Amino acid sequence: MGRVGTDVSQAVLNLTVEAAPNPWQGDLSLRNDGNAGSGEWRALGVTLKNDLLAPGDTLLMVGELDADQQAELGATISSISYTAPLSEQLKFTGSFGYSRRNLVEADGALRNLTTRQFQGYGQLEWVFKDSSRERWSAFAGISGNRNDSFLSGKSFSSTGPGGWNQTGYARIGASYGANQGRFSWNASVYGLQGMPSFSSDVQLQELSLLGIHPGDSRALGGSLNLNWFLSSTLQLSLRGSGQVAFNELTSDMGFTLGSDTGLKGLPGTYVSGDSGYLWTTELTWTFWTNRKMALQLAPFLGAGGVSSQRSLGDFSDTVGSGGLLLRWLANRNWNVELGWISPFDVEQMPYWEDWLLGSGVYTKLQYRF
């Protein structure tokens, strides 16, 4: 504090204020709902950093390892995403993902099958309104996908030469979210359009034999999520999503069912198709708590279905799962879940009938930082 002359009323106070840096955030978890064929156990890590290079930007990194009961590595999955603000209303997100899967749970020649995938995505988001109570936005993006297949280390492919398939599509839509005290919800709608320019002429010819013409591949979809705090100890969560394909779609445009899309009690990816629907509901009851820990019971139920049409024939399938979870939360860092689950409309359980999950037991250990 400095003083002008001898008059204390003319004193000047100079303050230097620096914004507190945003810490790294994330979580590490171990679960038993891996991917059928690649292993029951999955280790998942997520880390996020806001204001990394500029105010308002976000870096997100995700990594996953899947292994079978003999600790043989079956899948490696990773992705990185960066969101940069271009203006107060416009944001750009670029992401890149990589995965490699081995069928370590298979027998015979299938055990030597390996698939590798690269995926890139770029999206512009225009935020119309963003307040403490609601958020409106529109988005448009382009996705490119490449799949490589290997059998005993040698490339092969059912579409195109060289052992690789490449496809892409455009995605455009809008989203809305609102927070009304104890009640919050968000919804989104989107449209998909295949882009044949991502595929070679030979690949387009091979896809056409399956009835797939990327230039004609189109779909509409949407999702709705609701969260309602019925009381200080009861929370109801509802979710629904769906997609309708107007023509045959490439695999990267499909609709997927599994625990990765909210159906607890199933492998990460169970089944996919061009069109599909999904609904889930969960009621969380916090029946005991103190200043550092809490215990919760969470009954859940969900189901979905997919369908596809091909020149070789039509395909459709439905699946569901219900159960009860016991959840222990400690110090805002630890989350331990143990549950009984019961899948239904499951005619076969290839590779996962011998899992703990196949016996009706679900487990999860998570640490947040």
Question: Which residues are covered by each model-predicted region?
Answer:
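Transmembrane beta-barrel strands of outer-membrane/channel proteins
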Residues: R3, L28-N32, G45, L59-L65, ...
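Repeated loop/turn-to-beta-strand initiation elements of outer-membrane beta-barrel proteins
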Residues: P23-G26, L52-L59, E88-G94, S131-W136, ...
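Residues that define the transmembrane beta-barrel architecture of outer-membrane proteins
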Residues: S9-A11, G39-A43, G74-S78, R116-G120, ...
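Outer-membrane beta-barrel "beta-signal"
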Residues: T47, W328, N333, W340, ...
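Transmembrane beta-barrel domains of outer membrane proteins
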Residues: E18, L48-N50, S81-P85, Q123-K129, ...
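C-terminal outer-membrane beta-barrel translocator/porin domains of Gram-negative envelope proteins
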Residues: D148-L295, P299-A303, S307-Q309, V346-L356, ...
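Transmembrane beta-barrel wall of Gram-negative outer-membrane proteins
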Residues: D57, Q70-Y176
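Outer-membrane beta-barrel initiation region
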Residues: M1-T93, D130
